[in-house]
């Protein structure tokens, strides 16, 4: 009988291993400490959904916006699981999904849901990996790289001979922007906070790097451009570089505000746009730009082929286990990172 009991217990443990998974639960909107690891059932996909067995997960500023409650939570799931990107193999496929199948290796971006061993996501947010790229490079670059692609090609068509200013040039998006913008033939000016970050931005292809802890970035931009200013400003910092970002733009230039690492801009007066030279402002988000399957496939190919052949180097700041997600968020929000953080499983 003892052997039978032991065997049954082992079977239970084995079944539990198949049926249960580790996820990160958000218990309440607010600080990073509101996240904790829990065990839950492996989900089943509904119509139009897939479940991906993650190999690795990426960390993005977007995760902090959903976690803090800045962005409304997009689903009604019982457990709130943050996380915006991952790479892995499809574990199961929901009804109506025809362009992906079980076993396919995919990368994906999603508003929430990635901080799990088995991520339940909308199939439209995944793309099959057809280029041979290292898994950690994939999760350190997918959301950031697709963001870089739409900002440089679609939100504004950056062309050879133009001048672009990029805030947070040493961050994950910033380092990809420097390299890709240089490839296009534009003059790339980056702002950073601190000498170490300045070094990282220079390595990432920026022609000019301004440390805004040390110098007035608007005055520096005027000097670099001989008072001609920039065609476009790519701003993921917001509050602390406002309204200086607009002062760096040529008449009819575009201010592309795609994040707010230093806090939101409140009480923005649209009349400022006319006062500063008939400027344009946009607040884009990646999911609008990958809603079209062909555009999503093309942007992914443009990104991964550049990583595979070395045109784009992916900066990885650190690799941390899923259980250290609180620490990872605090690093990111403390603006202590140079490149992406990879969450390992």
Q: What is each PLM-predicted segment?
A:
Residues 192-195, 240-311, 344-345:
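Glycine-rich phosphate-binding loop and adjacent beta-alpha segment
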Residues 1-15:
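Single conserved hydrophobic/aromatic residue that forms the stacking wall/gate
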Residues 138, 142-214:
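Mid-domain Rossmann-like dinucleotide-binding core that forms the NAD(H)/NADP(H) cofactor-binding site
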Residues 41-58, 70-113:
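Glycine-rich beta-strand-centered segment in the early N-terminal region that forms part
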Residues 18-20, 279, 311-319, 326-345:
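C-terminal capping/lid region of NAD(P)-dependent oxidoreductase domains
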Residues 92, 105-168:
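NAD(P)H dinucleotide-binding glycine-rich loop of Rossmann-like/cofactor-binding domains
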Residues 105, 163, 187, 253-254, ...:
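Short glycine-centered segments of the SAM/dcSAM-binding site in methyltransferase folds
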């Amino acid at each position: 009988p003892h052997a039978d009991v032991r065997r049954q217990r082992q079977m239970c443990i084995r079944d539990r291993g198949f049926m249960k998974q580790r996820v990160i639960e958000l218990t309440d909107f607010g600080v990073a400490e509101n996240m904790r690891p829990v065990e839950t059932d492996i989900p089943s996909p509904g119509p139009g959904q897939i479940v991906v067995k993650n190999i690795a997960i990426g960390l993005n500023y977007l995760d902090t916006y959903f976690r803090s409650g800045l962005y409304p939570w997009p689903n009604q799931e019982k457990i709130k699981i943050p996380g915006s990107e991952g790479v892995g193999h499809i574990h199961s496929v929901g009804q109506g999904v025809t362009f992906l199948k079980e076993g396919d290796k995919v990368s994906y971006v999603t508003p929430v849901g990635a901080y799990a061993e088995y991520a339940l996501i909308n199939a439209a947010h995944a793309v099959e990996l057809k280029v041979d790229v290292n898994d950690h490079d994939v999760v350190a670059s997918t959301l950031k790289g697709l963001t870089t692609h739409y900002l440089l090609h679609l939100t504004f068509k950056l062309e050879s001979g133009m001048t672009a200013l990029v805030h947070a040039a040493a961050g994950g998006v910033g380092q990809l922007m420097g390299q890709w913008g240089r490839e296009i033939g534009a003059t790339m000016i980056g702002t950073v906070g601190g000498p170490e970050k300045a070094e990282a931005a220079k390595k990432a292809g920026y022609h000019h790097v301004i440390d805004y802890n040390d110098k007035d970035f608007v005055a520096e931009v005027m000097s670099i451009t001989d008072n001609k200013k920039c065609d476009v400003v790519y701003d993921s910092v917001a509050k602390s570089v406002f309204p200086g970002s607009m002062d760096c733009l040529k008449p009819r230039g575009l201010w592309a505000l795609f994040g707010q690492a230093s806090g939101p801009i409140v009480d923005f007066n649209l009349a400022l746009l006319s006062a500063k030279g008939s400027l344009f402002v946009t607040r884009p988000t990646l999911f609008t730009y990958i809603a079209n399957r062909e555009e999503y496939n093309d942007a992914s190919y443009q990104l991964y082929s550049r990583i595979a052949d070395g045109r784009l180097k992916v900066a990885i700041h650190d690799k941390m286990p899923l259980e250290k997600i609180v620490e990872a968020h605090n690093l990111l929000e403390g603006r202590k990172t140079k490149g992406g953080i990879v969450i390992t499983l």
